[in-house]
Regions:
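Short amphipathic alpha-helix used as the core "switch/output" element in two-component signaling
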Residues: 40, 60-75
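Alpha4 helix (beta4-alpha4-beta5 surface) of REC/receiver domains from two-component response regulators
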Residues: 63-64, 83-101, 111
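C-terminal output helix
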Residues: 104-115, 121
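Two-component/phosphorelay signaling modules centered on CheY-like receiver
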Residues: 12-30
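Acidic, metal-coordinating helix/loop segments flanking the phosphotransfer/catalytic sites
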Residues: 31-49, 57
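CheY-like receiver
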Residues: 119-147
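Hydrophobic/aromatic residues positioned on beta-strands within the core alpha/beta folds
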Residues: 79-81
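The short loop immediately C-terminal to the conserved phospho-acceptor aspartate in CheY-like receiver
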Residues: 11, 55-57
Length: 147
């Protein structure tokens, strides 16, 4: 069974590139081009993970997607994708589990997503809730391709 990801970003090139990469690696991917559309999709389908850009319609539109994801009974893992990593740890306090910085290379993206999905599933199994997840180690070799 393919794992389902909702990808939310207002940049069409990012959406299409990430969707193609993730589908080549056996993920089922749906996309949304705004926080509003992403929040609506979260209520109409079930996802294993949500990856959202932070800055879309507004500087903090990604937080709307995070809130919508956290409100779902199926508790998807949540990752923030941003070109502006100066968010500090605010993304954690808002409920996201991982921060992905654009441009991200393919190997690093896949490694982080696999780690996040594994840890999220393990934590859901232990306590039925989303617990903070440990960061993956940084020693994996990174492919030169960047998104």
């Amino acid at each position: 069974m393919k794992r389902r990801i909702l990808l939310v970003d207002d940049e069409l090139a990012i959406l299409l590139t990430l969707k193609a990469i993730l589908e080549m690696h056996h993920f089922e991917v749906e996309t949304a081009s705004s926080a509003k559309e992403g929040a609506q999709r979260l209520t109409k389908a079930t996802y294993d993970m949500v990856i959202t850009d932070m800055r879309m319609e507004t500087e903090t539109a990604g937080y709307d997607v995070i809130r919508a994801a956290k409100a779902q009974p199926y508790e998807p893992a949540v990752a923030v994708l941003t070109a502006y990593p100066s968010l500090g740890s605010d993304w954690k306090t808002k409920g996201a589990h991982s921060l992905l910085v654009k441009p991200v290379n393919t190997d690093e993206l896949l490694r982080q997503l696999e780690h996040l999905l594994s840890m999220h599933q393990l934590n859901k199994g232990k306590n039925g809730k989303n617990a903070p997840l440990p960061r993956p180690d940084k020693t994996a070799k990174a492919e030169k391709k960047a998104i």
